[in-house]
């Protein structure tokens, strides 16, 4: 028994020693972590600049709980934050703010702006948890701020937020006012040149600025520039935020809305702080769009009428509100429902005239009520002006005399009243003058691609282009259809390196084929490696070692695609050569194997998000680098994207889940049956063993009785 007790005591002592060792190690690790977390950091800043003191919070068990933040300077408390309430010392008032929701800084970090020379010193962050015991953990960071000397400004200006009508005051105390001069700027403009501020600002002898009274237009960035006699210059900036009640700045006396069409009734207001509510009244009563069918509130408070009718006419007023209140309702806006004009006479779709003749294009319109005549204006759809000395207007009819080749094109007649504008188009064609074919063909190339561009011969609606091309040695032509009617370029791919190709551009419209352009020849760049060495060529292309065109601009390289929730994110590397001449990137994608152009886009970044790609489809993507001067474009290598079918994936997941569940159920049933069988077998074995034990015990009793009988007989015989 004593040996057992001693063994128990030895085990308890070993466990206690192990526990003490673990606690000691944890204490050492926590102390080292605290020392590392509270290491001192040296920072430098100039007068008038800003600096961020970073301070992370170590929550217990990584669970955020209420915390208290203290910042001290040279062991004097300067800033306190607790539950969205702050307290700042007078010297740092308006200059020290908590940094909120920034991924690079901790929750207890602060930003010190408008730094002064007196801000130099030691800063310490301390975080505590009032509702937890112990309330202090390993939170805290120490910083030493060194303010660079030799400046001209002793006290820089500080950002201010005041109410309209109050006085704004900015410090700009010069270090040596006897040989320095200060000047103030608002948004980069000298204050003496700002007409609204000329009579309301005053500069003190030390360089400080005061504005009295302030107006809402005074909001902006103010900059103080101090220059000494030696020509040294120092600047400091501060922002002035003017807050005022929400007010209406403009309200038209009358607004015409088109009958039967959508329309918007705006309320022109300004508010700082931002708008919180906008109240509309009609004919002196509250106008709630939620109770009026077909009328909705827009995000800016405007009224949107889905379909204007006579019931929407009336006298409207709007009243904006913000946190400071309202400056009052707007003047009355009389809303008049007016029917849009209709054409009584419209021009024909096509007019064919001869050179030197006159063309007359009729156009007349009336209001639906027949009382007023809308104003009619003629113009060309391509934006070119009408011939000043050869056209005349009579009512709504346009007459052009002495027709020349340049007069052909599409003309628009616009009829306008106070409610809406309607248009009608007519095309003027000159007889015996064939439509001009595409011209001014230009191109640039890589080893396997040629991008060709052209100018349209003439502008017509629904005009389509087809590029015809062939190898100079080949007898047959190939075609590439340009599906986007607004694009005047095409990229022919899968060409042979170092070969010359011939091109023609055919314009087509709904009236039939047009004319071919002049034949144009261009050569692909020679390949520095063998054409059959595809792997080496692809590797060289991926690494961006593509021979630059004549302009020196290289091709984008390392084009990749990553699937995400929005679709596919494309990413590529900038060209190795000619990056200074890069203007933008053009992204194009086709549906394969039809090689059908799905879309194109332009971006200034080296990435682009592809959205809404059709499932279970193969797409080909290419990125072109577009230059600034010569408008050249250099394509990257092609990338294939196989968009999987989400339906198949979902079906596979559901089928797999059902299969796994079925297997689990089968396994559970098998285990249950097996356990029942084993339990039944064990029950039989136990009953059999009990019977055998009973039989054996009976035999033993009979033997013992016989032995006793024999012993009794022997005793009697001996007696």
Swiss-Prot record:
PROSITE patterns: FN3 (PS50853), IG_LIKE (PS50835). Disulfide bonds join 55-125, 172-224, 267-318, 363-413. Residues 672-719 are cytoplasmic. Residues 688-704 have a biased composition (Acidic residues). The chain crosses the membrane at residues 651-671. In the visual system, expressed in lamina and medulla (at protein level). One of its GO terms (cellular component) is plasma membrane. It comes from the Eukaryota. It holds the Pfam family I-set. It is found in: Cell membrane; Cell projection, Axon. Residues 34-650 are extracellular. GO terms for biological process: axon ensheathment; axon guidance; axonal transport; dendrite self-avoidance; glial cell growth; homophilic cell adhesion via plasma membrane adhesion molecules; neuron cell-cell adhesion; R7 cell development. Residues 705-719 have a biased composition (Basic and acidic residues). Residues 40-128, 134-241, 246-334, 341-429 form the Ig-like domain. It is a single-pass membrane protein. Interacts with tutl. Belongs to the immunoglobulin superfamily. This is Protein borderless. The gene is bdl.
